[in-house]
């Protein structure tokens, strides 16, 4: 349910945010901008889930893929918006790369579908990522997402 919600959010942003680049992953990062830009939502979602879904989440590998394939896209004008729970299934969260990402970007906004009480429990690395985030918040509904993004972006100009 959270995946569909997040993909619908990214789909809605296409065409409304200049220079938007959208990526998704479970264990390997994929550029999902082309299907979101060119296909009806259900078709885009099915294709993205086929290409990306099904694996255990590995944030460390996603940061490595971002570094290897798309790092030049991130600079002092970039807002990085991470929509995810930060659960990396006991894999290396690659705080080194996430820290570099945060240093390169203008800001990093992370919105988790899990409430704050679950952050850092079990396989969650969210509290480890927290120091690198300009804003870390909870967003499980469309209203939460809208409020959290408005707060994060207005607070940091």
In which residue ranges do the predicted regions lie?
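A short acidic, amphipathic alpha-helical/loop segment
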Residues: 5-9, 94-100, 125
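A short, conserved beta-to-alpha structural element at the edge of catalytic cores
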Residues: 13-35, 104-123
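Short acidic, Gly/Ser-rich segments with clustered Asp/Glu that frequently serve as metal-coordination loops
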Residues: 1-5, 29, 86-90
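Exposed acidic/Ser/Thr-rich ligand/metal-binding surfaces
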Residues: 63-107, 137, 148-156
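Von Willebrand factor
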Residues: 30-32, 36, 43-78, 115, ...
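An amphipathic, basic-hydrophobic helix/alpha-beta surface used to engage anionic
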Residues: 1-19
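Von Willebrand factor type A / integrin I
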Residues: 99-157
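Active-site proximal loops enriched in glycine and acidic residues that flank catalytic Cys/His/Asp
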Residues: 24-27, 82-84, 91, 112-115, ...
